[in-house]
Design a protein with these regions (language model features):
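N-proximal low-complexity "stem/linker" segments adjacent to membrane-targeting elements
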Residues: 1-29, 36
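Acidic helix N-cap motif at the loop->helix transition within catalytic regions
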Residues: 18-22, 49-58
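Acceptor/aglycone-binding surface of glycosyltransferases and processive sugar-polymer synthases
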Residues: 70-86, 91, 103-184, 211-220
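Hydrophobic helical membrane-anchoring modules
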Residues: 1-6, 147, 154-155, 178-260
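Short loop->beta transition adjacent to catalytic acidic/histidine clusters or analogous donor-positioning motifs
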Residues: 5-7, 28-41, 50, 63-66
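A conserved acidic beta->alpha catalytic loop
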Residues: 44-53, 99
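Conserved donor nucleotide-binding strand/loop of the catalytic core
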Residues: 38, 52-86
Length: 260
């Protein structure tokens, strides 16, 4: 009988044939050294290149790799949601295929998840470091978005969009079952839902490196992201979100912020 994975690691992908194979090998090499069972779920968000073919070849060699394929491009939020609802691990984490945050961060994240419902990587607080910065205009827009989302959603976290996040499995499934935003602002929505329902959000400072080959269209995606934040408030005000049940077996009511 196959063991239940200790962790399900999700990687959303869209047209990633040029860097997927190399970074997939890095992730598998890291996970293969672990004493626990794991699964690596690659979500192909309607790619038009050979992304799925690359994953299928890897999965034929490594049985712990799974491919989840969306027929058409729906957005990062929709891809992560699909992956979470398909995951079987005790813990669920996701990161970006560019590995802008080192895969080794998963070790600390899993430790922190012993006492927190949600752990998020942040690059804008004490203890974090940026090895290679984004262009100034992108950093500026990121700061504006963080302030805007914190004010509108009353969430108050240091950073929303760092790609590395982890959850206790049942918490992830509850939050992502409720989550509705398909695009880039899904991070803010999930953290809003977590805070709204009393789950602890632990901020872990990370070392981050900007990846030049981004698929973000700064003007289009900025406008859509700002609209999505208002949409989240609209959904909440008019009762579109289902009630997320609290987990009684752990006390996640007090926020814990890691300074490691």
């Amino acid at each position: 009988m196959k063991k239940i994975p200790h962790v399900s690691l999700l990687i959303p992908c869209y047209n990633e044939e040029h860097r997927l194979s190399k970074n997939l090998n890095k992730i598998v090499k890291f996970l293969s050294k672990k004493p626990y069972a794991w699964e690596l779920i690659i979500i192909d968000d309607g790619s038009k290149d050979k992304t799925s073919d690359i994953v299928s070849r890897q999965a034929a060699v490594e049985s712990s790799i799974r491919l989840v394929k969306l027929k058409k491009n729906q957005g990062k939020g929709a891809a992560i949601r699909k992956g979470v609802l398909n995951a079987t691990g005790n813990y669920i984490a996701f990161t970006d295929v560019d590995l802008s945050v080192s895969i080794e961060t998963l070790d600390v994240m899993l430790t922190l998840l012993q006492s927190s419902a949600v752990v998020i990587g942040v690059r804008r607080r004490k203890g974090s470091s940026i090895k290679k910065h984004q262009p100034l205009y992108r950093e500026f827009m990121g700061h504006i978005f963080t302030k805007y989302a914190n004010i509108v959603l009353n969430v108050w976290v240091s950073h929303f969009t760092c790609g590395f996040k982890g959850f206790e499995s049942s918490v992830a499934k509850q939050l992502f079952h409720t989550q509705r935003v398909p695009g880039w602002s899904f991070d803010a929505e999930v953290l809003y839902l977590a805070k709204r329902n009393g789950y602890a959000v632990c901020e872990h400072p990370v070392e981050w490196t900007n990846e030049e080959n981004t698929k973000v269209n700064i003007l289009r995606d900025a406008v859509l992201s700002f609209i999505d934040i208002l949409r989240i408030r609209y959904y909440s005000f008019f009762g579109y979100y289902e009630s997320v049940e609290k987990i009684s077996r752990k006390n996640y009511m007090t926020d814990r912020k890691s300074t490691t």
